[in-house]
């Protein structure tokens, strides 16, 4: 397990960890013959869906594709407050869906991404989904897959796939 520093709770802002109670399911991958056999799985974050770390010494052994993470959250919504979802690391693109509202797809990578979800959050139970896309041969991100590089062994096996850092509200 990876441990991250505890958040300060003595400020005016309340930060709630959403790292527990996720369900994840592959939607498609470059290894569909293997990943299609994997049922929806319960996970905690951080979570790397690609367990290949270069040990097979392949030029391109990385897993690419899409998956969806889902969970319910219960919120005591107060009208005078704003609610932000913070993703600290998703490889490579993330699409947030809050109670059926689909936010635009964002390049997240190894940066922190924050979205104001106040307008689509309800008092009480809410459904949250994060669609994760990690395609092959990425050209619009500084964090490319080493296996997709034309250079042999360039960071091969080092690219995570999924939500690999904390998520908070």
Task: Identify the function of each model-found stretch.
Residues 1-88, 143-166:
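Extended carbohydrate-recognition surfaces in non-catalytic/accessory domains of CAZymes
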Residues 3-5, 97-149:
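Beta-strand-rich ligand-recognition modules
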Residues 70-74, 82-86, 95-97, 116, ...:
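Residues within well-ordered beta-strands of beta-sheet-rich folds
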Residues 91-92:
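Short, solvent-exposed aromatic-acidic interface loops
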């Amino acid at each position: 397990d990876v441990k991250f520093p505890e958040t300060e709770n003595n400020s005016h802002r309340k930060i709630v960890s959403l790292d527990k109670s996720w369900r994840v399911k592959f939607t498609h991958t470059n290894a569909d013959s293997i990943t299609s056999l994997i049922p929806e799985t319960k996970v905690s974050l951080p979570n790397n869906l690609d367990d290949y770390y270069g040990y097979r010494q392949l030029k391109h052994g990385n897993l690419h594709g899409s998956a969806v993470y889902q969970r319910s959250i219960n919120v005591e919504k107060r009208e005078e407050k704003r609610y932000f979802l913070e993703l600290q690391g998703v490889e490579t693109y993330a699409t947030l869906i809050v109670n059926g509202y689909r936010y635009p797809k964002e390049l997240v990578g190894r940066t922190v991404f924050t979205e104001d979800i106040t307008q689509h959050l309800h008092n009480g139970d809410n459904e949250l989904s994060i669609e994760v896309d990690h395609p092959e041969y990425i050209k619009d991100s500084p964090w490319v897959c080493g296996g997709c590089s034309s250079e042999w062994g360039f960071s091969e096996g080092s690219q995570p796939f999924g939500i690999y850092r904390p998520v908070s509200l």
